[in-house]
Amino acid sequence: MLVFKSTMECSISSTIHVLGSCKTSDDVNQIHGRLIKTGIIKNSNLTTRIVLAFASSRRPYLADFARCVFHEYHVCSFSFGEVEDPFLWNAVIKSHSHGKDPRQALLLLCLMLENGVSVDKFSLSLVLKACSRLGFVKGGMQIHGFLKKTGLWSDLFLQNCLIGLYLKCGCLGLSRQMFDRMPKRDSVSYNSMIDGYVKCGLIVSARELFDLMPMEMKNLISWNSMISGYAQTSDGVDIASKLFADMPEKDLISWNSMIDGYVKHGRIEDAKGLFDVMPRRDVVTWATMIDGYAKLGFVHHAKTLFDQMPHRDVVAYNSMMAGYVQNKYHMEALEIFSDMEKESHLLPDDTTLVIVLPAIAQLGRLSKAIDMHLYIVEKQFYLGGKLGVALIDMYSKCGSIQHAMLVFEGIENKSIDHWNAMIGGLAIHGLGESAFDMLLQIERLSLKPDDITFVGVLNACSHSGLVKEGLLCFELMRRKHKIEPRLQHYGCMVDILSRSGSIELAKNLIEEMPVEPNDVIWRTFLTACSHHKEFETGELVAKHLILQAGYNPSSYVLLSNMYASFGMWKDVRRVRTMMKERKIEKIPGCSWIELDGRVHEFFVDSIEVSSTL
């Protein structure tokens, strides 16, 4: 506990020093009490020093104390008509505009104006910053009007602040009006507008302004904005490449933007060419290349680069794990996670866990799922976002709907994503009635379901044979929530009708769909035709499927099985022969089983068993 020695003179410097060493709000309150008791708090030099030293402190309890001192000993004691330098006011406005409640900056500006305190360009620029953070365009426009009434309108710095505010609030037209009316512009004016156009996808407008920009004003920010904008589109990568070549100087952002553009559009060799010759690389460079190789399926190339990295951070580990998960190397992803903890001593972030949990889910390792959940609880990760969704999904796919429900019930502020994950889990476990009840709960709580909610409920109804509930859900989606059905919704409805034996209704729905049915819907319908002995319809569907997706083995297998169910062995042999001639092979089934802490992998028609930790 921090205390003053009774014999110590409470000088201003020592007070500031002791305040700076405070670890908690209780420490600050104790010192505040002592300052009041000794009367030193009335010293304006001390209060000024406190405000200037701590108003923008990263320690909330110190920043709050500084603001409190300012309001109590400066604002409340201020006399109207008294001339006061706005410097101290600006320090507190800055504290609010960059802090957790930017609205206080606006209130403080109003207080300055009411009390006749001189307002300068720094006061206004800080309040414009607060308006930007709040998306409060109306407040920005009021300040814009105030500038015109005072003599500050011609200040280039404030004009640039207004452009930035309008762009941040999505008012591209207002920012361009502001830009066009400026009698004088600098590189900040041009760069702000160019960046605004790029972020809105208006690369042509950005290029027009870039070409109008005086050459002496163009700097790295200007060039990098244009390269980044062009690199986002497939037809703009080559233009970005030409701009990159024409740049008078390049920095790391220039190289990374160009590499990112190549990677995004699958041009990994071009990206590698730049990667090999660039003078300096950072973690972003390496992570971008790893991600690019992984997305193209070149996981081993990605791992080679990962192993070559001189320094790895969480982003690099996340990229490698995500690459493994995308390519279904789930065990390898878990090994990378283990290496991250044991070798690098890096702490995983939310993104790390959102990548790792689906890997565990795909392996179905309940023991590993429980261990990971305990780890998340121990490290006090927040489950209100994507992590909670991934945790529910993991338990559902690992076979424990009870654990999934416990996680779901323990999340206080549930978003629709949490409800969707729980409904999806209930669907996996064939608990259609519970899933439908959850939809009714969502309705009662006045939450807004989305298209994924209805995919989950329809899927659950399909697995549980709930025809009436499925039809009700479909109508609720369309009529009440005005959600246009997508292929997934139609697929679920075809499955619901087909499973119930309503082949004709399912056929009519397929024919009336406003979108072209995909092969999944046709295969669902074909399976139902086979099951319900609708031979003629099924044969037509199968032949259509083979024409539409001629190299998908499941279509041939379904047709063969249907012929077999009718004892048409000659036709079965004909389909099998067709598969051989076209070199179409069934994808072998694979299963995992966890035994004594090891996962064993089994493949159909294989006597070998692979195992891993």
Swiss-Prot record:
GO terms for molecular function: RNA binding. The keyword S-adenosyl-L-methionine does not apply. Transmembrane segments: none annotated. Its main location: plastid. One of its GO terms (biological process) is chloroplast RNA modification. Residues 521-596 are annotated as: Type E motif. Interacts with DYW1. NCBIfam families: PPR. This is Pentatricopeptide repeat-containing protein At2g45350, chloroplastic. It comes from Arabidopsis thaliana. The lineage of its organism: Eukaryota, Viridiplantae, Streptophyta, Embryophyta, Tracheophyta.
